[in-house]
């Protein structure tokens, strides 16, 4: 497995804080290639490999920053609230993936330059709306 393939396997699963199960399972699967994998009551992954070599500790966060859905507007836009250290200055126009029964893709809405008053401000409360190209009824399903 190349370094790029390894990084893709580690970063592809959705693992927003509080919903890390898919990231956790992916990591356990990768580590099982190297030894016996178990977990403790705190959710730590432990790999045991027979031998007399040195022990190592890999200490890292498993979760990622992201958003949680807080509502759907009458026009079908998705209202979201940041989870974790999202820098709201960087999200305008960003593509987001909503994980549900099926993945749904959307783009964080921005005010077009010709409609802007030139005083565009970053969301102070960590909220924004996302256009998924659906009407409200379809978005709710």
Spans of features found by a protein language model:
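N-terminal hydrophobic/helix-forming segments and targeting peptides
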Residues: 1-141
């Amino acid at each position: 497995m190349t370094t790029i393939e390894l990084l893709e396997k580690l970063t592809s699963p959705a693992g927003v804080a509080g919903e890390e199960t898919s990231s956790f399972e992916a990591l356990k699967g990768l580590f099982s290639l190297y030894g016996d994998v178990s977990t403790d009551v705190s959710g730590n992954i432990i790999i045991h490999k027979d031998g007399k070599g040195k022990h190592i500790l890999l200490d890292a966060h498993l979760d990622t920053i992201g958003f949680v859905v807080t509502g759907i507007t009458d026009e079908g836009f998705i209202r979201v609230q940041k989870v974790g250290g999202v820098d709201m200055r960087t999200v305008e126009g960003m593509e987001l993936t909503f994980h549900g029964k099926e993945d749904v893709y959307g783009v964080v809405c921005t005010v077009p330059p010709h409609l802007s008053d030139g005083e565009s401000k970053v969301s102070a409360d960590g909220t924004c709306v996302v256009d998924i190209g659906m009407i409200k009824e379809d978005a709710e399903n």
